[in-house]
Amino acid sequence: MAVTTRLTWLHEKILQNHFGGKRLSLLYKGSVHGFHNGVLLDRCCNQGPTLTVIYSEDHIIGAYAEEGYQERKYASIILFALQETKISEWKLGLYTPETLFCCDVAKYNSPTNFQIDGRNRKVIMDLKTMENLGLAQNCTISIQDYEVFRCEDSLDERKIKGVIELRKSLLSALRTYEPYGSLVQQIRILLLGPIGAGKSSFFNSVRSVFQGHVTHQALVGTNTTGISEKYRTYSIRDGKDGKYLPFILCDSLGLSEKEGGLCMDDISYILNGNIRDRYQFNPMESIKLNHHDYIDSPSLKDRIHCVAFVFDASSIEYFSSQMIVKIKRIRRELVNAGVVHVALLTHVDSMDLITKGDLIEIERCVPVRSKLEEVQRKLGFALSDISVVSNYSSEWELDPVKDVLILSALRRMLWAADDFLEDLPFEQIGNLREEIINCAQGKK
């Protein structure tokens, strides 16, 4: 059976971030391997940067050795005390591991300001050390358990190589993607969501990945009325002079709890393909049938094939009842129209304690998982229909980890669009294929 740490996810993340964003790999656990410091050192020496965590009834304390433990060699030791979500530290100075762990005390003349005595299950430290760590003035702390971790880079060379390979695979899949049945040349994906959720930023991020540098074609902002006031349909080129990719991202005015957001009646017109690019939204009323941007007889290529709801991860818990009712109403309309829809969770990288290393397996990250479950609980989305992304906002350079999240979300949207096309009535598909064949043969 695998040996697991006693640390909670929160405490582990606090320690990781405090000591340089390292990933903790468990080497030794007293309750499993025994409370024998000699055995501990045999197992934990020459492992690189090392973190020792000691659990008592009332405290979590420990020691960090940046150079790691090496037999009879001095290493700089930093002591720490973790109390709830706060961590304090004290630079103890240079120690050999034999001194720190009370091995052969007589020979190495161990000082008494800090000792880890595994055999007697206690930590001894002087009053000054206690005070510097913010602990109660009790010179002896009983050990319930202790663990030693190797501190590894959260993004080592092997992981980075894997991310780069996955990025290449996703780019290839999206470049060569063909909509189901060749019924349309480009999939139309509508981005819907509250004002400021990151809809325009997601388009910019997708475009950045395929352009090879960070771009800002769509204006973004953080004010309460949003930036997108027009209906925009964005085709994206593969590179500066490349061909257009097989999808179009459609941006709209954001949803609002009060006045100023997207008029609900406009949504059905957008879905049906009745609204032309650059139509100026009117929050107070929907488009008029005689408007010059109204399309009378849209074809399948003009319709929306997938809807992606975009939500800011940091705002889900603050959704008002009005916003929840509005989103659920739109979802019902989409179901009635047969339009497949997914959810996109943005701004996850701004959540507390999230590091770049977490983005590789972001959906396993405890706080992100909590947000996914909150979207499921409040809005009814299946967990499998929710993607997590980190948009480009303040960066100057592309990041392969972010690219993988963005491309994976886009691929999921295209799969959803294929489901929509495949589910079209047989008669409609037959007529469309006949039109496609006639066009290919030059017939009218």
From Swiss-Prot:
Hepatocytes. Coiled coil: none annotated. GO terms for cellular component: cytoplasm. InterPro entries: P-loop_NTPase (IPR027417), TLDc_dom (IPR006571). GO terms for biological process: cellular response to virus; immune response; response to bacterium. Induction: During infection of non-A non-B hepatitis virus or hepatitis delta virus. Residues 1-152 form the TLDc domain. It is found in: Cytoplasm. SUPFAM superfamilies: P-loop containing nucleoside triphosphate hydrolases (SSF52540). The keyword Transmembrane does not apply. Keywords: Cytoplasm. Belongs to the IFI44 family. This protein aggregates to form microtubular structures. This is Interferon-induced protein 44. It comes from Pan troglodytes.
